[in-house]
Swiss-Prot record:
One of its GO terms (cellular component) is plasma membrane. Pfam families: AA_permease (PF00324). The gene is GAP4. It comes from Candida albicans (strain SC5314 / ATCC MYA-2876) (Yeast). This is S-adenosylmethionine permease GAP4. Its main location: membrane. Induction: Expression is under control of the CSY1 amino-acid sensor. Expression is also regulated by HAP43, GCN2, GCN4 and SSN6. Induced during biofilm development. Residues 11-30 have a biased composition (Polar residues). GO terms for biological process: amino acid transmembrane transport; S-adenosyl-L-methionine transport.
Length: 607
């Protein structure tokens, strides 16, 4: 544009100097303009082209967004399951399921570290303390924590080897039998599905700590929209949100631990506390039943710790990022649960009135502990952290349920439409289905919504223990299948540090936990045998059996209880196809680690 103006000015000054008339000047100006157009282009056309290009870019952007919701053609992925057996179809379909691989190592690390921190820890630990006392809470968290440690390590070994859609849900079908995959998968999806509306209600009730004038249904709607929008951004949206929310939750727990140690040692209105509440009123409440009653609360607190494996199929390089996330399990269990349980037991007696009679955030031992220490602003901070935790768990609920439902659908265990994957790698129908269940959160306006959700949760009350136990069984069958087919453990990319011993002991611990829960459900604490209480706590047990039998009958597979070890597919779904090359690379990596100093080897074992 400046070029054209300069040319015209030069021509006009030249014409004036030589005595040209106005027509000649105009003609010269037009010629100059034409030459300028020829040399530098017509600026008006440039402007118009720029406008058109901008409009086209905007149209293309919205078109790309629109097209991203169209289905991913599985035939383009090379999937033809028409001539395959149910087991073969399950294995191949889950291996080639086109979920987007957009999670990075930092996402996986924070999902592993802080993804399971939620209302189970911040509020549920209070119920455990009231029923069992500080000693029972510590024992219960240690026992369930050990069981989870074996599960996550076993699952890490399997997920690094086979980063397939659905993770452990697909492993149930591959290493056990598709009916087990359908049963455990639906129970697992149901637990997340029911968690979403309950977390929405928890968020609305938590907000009422500050404002009781706004109808809680309004807050349910707000949080529902936020969670749904996050998940419609795909796995990258889920990963980024969990990354930042987990950082906040981790900082909050670490801050509480530091503050709790200070209050215990005498910083606060109460002076030195130490372990006096372990002596008066005592370490245990209700004896062995009190210890057993902690298991369900502990399972609720630990729930979601396995999500890191579910995310493996959507991770760019699970071979590198997943082992590091799995190894951190020991530290997060110890720091965020065991250490927190010890501090809570030191700061809050199980006879505390707020603990026994409070509701919501008021019954949180975190809030009670700092309030008794004379720090008045911290309850508001913890309340905000609980809101963040609720959003995080709601976000994970949609993610966990939708991925599980989509995996079941692609395996042929649910209607095909549930496995709809759009071009953005989102299981769209499964996300919308899970989000629709979240609308049950509007039951917050009903007077007896607590009873409704008690029965909802009874569907999946023990399902976490069944799922975790089945993961350990799958790990054992994976190792047994390697031996039965003459394969070496040298081809295992990441070996569970606890090995098969961990899986065996984990199964034993989980069986004892389930037996204890059935006992406490039949004969509740402080009351005679109660049939209704039993069904509230153990409905998932007969439901699991009926569901498994239904799958066996529908698929007419009663002639096969297990997939034979010799018939288990040990290759489909690997990202490293050349087994011999893989074994060579792994041997070199292990040799490098062996050559390092002892301190480094210890570091690599734990991190």
């Amino acid at each position: 544009m400046s070029y054209k103006g300069n040319d015209i000015e030069k021509q006009q000054s030249a014409s004036t100097a030589t005595g040209f008339n106005d027509k000649q000047i105009a003609s010269t100006s037009e010629d100059a303009t034409d030459r300028s157009h020829n040399i530098h282009g017509d600026t008006s056309s440039l402007d118009s082209r720029y406008t058109y290009e901008t409009v086209d870019q905007e149209k293309n952007y919205f078109k790309r967004v629109y097209n991203s919701f169209k289905p991913m053609n599985l035939e383009e992925q090379g999937i033809d399951t028409s001539q395959l057996t149910p087991v073969e179809r399950t294995i191949i379909a889950s291996a080639k399921h086109p979920l987007a691989r957009r999670l990075k190592a930092r996402h996986l690390q924070m999902i592993a570290i802080g993804g399971s921190i939620g209302t189970g820890l911040f509020v549920g630990s209070g119920y455990a303390l009231a029923n069992g006392g500080p000693g029972a809470v510590l024992i219960g968290y240690v026992i369930v924590g050990y069981a989870l440690l074996t599960v996550v390590n076993a699952l890490g070994e399997l997920s690094v080897q086979f980063p397939v859609s659905g993770s452990f849900n697909a492993f149930f079908s591959r290493f056990l039998e598709p009916s087990f995959g359908g049963t455990f998968g639906i129970l697992y999806a149901a637990s997340w599905c029911i968690s979403l509306p309950s977390e929405l209600i928890a968020a609305a009730m938590t907000i009422q700590y500050w404002n009781t004038e706004v109808n809680p249904a309004v807050w349910v709607a707000v949080f529902w929209v936020v969670i749904v929008v996050i998940n419609l951004f795909g796995v990258k949206g889920y990963g980024e949100m969990e990354y930042f929310l987990s950082i906040i939750k981790v900082l909050a727990v670490v801050g509480f631990i530091i503050l709790g140690i200070c209050i215990t040692c005498g910083v606060g209105d109460q002076g030195y506390i130490g372990g006096k509440y372990w002596h008066n009123p005592g370490a245990f409440n209700h004896g062995l039943k009190g210890v057993t009653s902690v298991f369900i609360s502990a399972a609720f607190s630990f729930g979601g710790i396995e999500l890191v494996a579910l995310a493996a199929s959507e991770t760019a390089n699970p071979r590198i990022s997943l082992p590091a996330a799995v190894k951190s399990t020991f530290w997060r269990i110890f720091i965020f649960y065991i250490l927190t349980a010890i501090i809570i037991g030191c700061l809050v007696p199980y006879t505390n009135d707020d603990l026994l009679n409070g509701t919501g955030i008021a019954a949180s031992p975190f809030v009670i502990a700092v309030s008794q220490g004379g720090i008045r602003v911290v309850p508001h901070i913890m309340n905000a952290v609980v809101v963040i935790a609720v959003i995080s768990v709601g976000n994970s609920s949609v993610y966990g349920c939708s991925r599980t439902l989509a995996s079941l659908a692609v395996q042929g265990l649910l209607p095909k439409s549930m496995g709809y994957i759009d071009r953005g790698g989102r299981p769209l129908i499964a996300i919308l289905f899970t989000s629709a269940i979240g609308l049950l959160g509007f039951l917050v306006v009903v007077d007896n919504e607590g009873d409704v959700f008690t029965w909802f949760f009874s569907i999946c009350s023990l399902s976490s223990f069944f799922t975790w136990g089945a993961i350990n069984v799958v790990h054992l069958r994976w190792r047994f299948a390697l031996a039965a087919q003459g394969r070496s453990t040298d081809e295992i990319i990441f070996r569970s540090p606890l090995g098969t011993f961990g899986s065996w002991t984990g199964i034993l611990v989980l069986i004892l936990i389930v037996i204890g829960e059935v006992w406490v459900s039949i004969w509740p604490i402080g009351s005679p045998a109660d049939v209704q209480q039993f069904w509230k706590n153990c409905l998932s047990l007969p439901l699991m059996i009926v569901m498994w039998a239904g799958f066996k009958t529908y698929h007419r597979s009663w002639n096969m209880l297990w997939v034979k070890l010799e018939d288990i597919d040990l290759d489909t779904g690997r990202r490293e196809i050349d087994v011999e090359l893989l074994k060579q690379e792994l041997a070199e990596e292990r040799q490098i680690i062996k050559s390092k100093p002892f301190v480094y080897r210890i570091y690599k074992f734990f991190f």
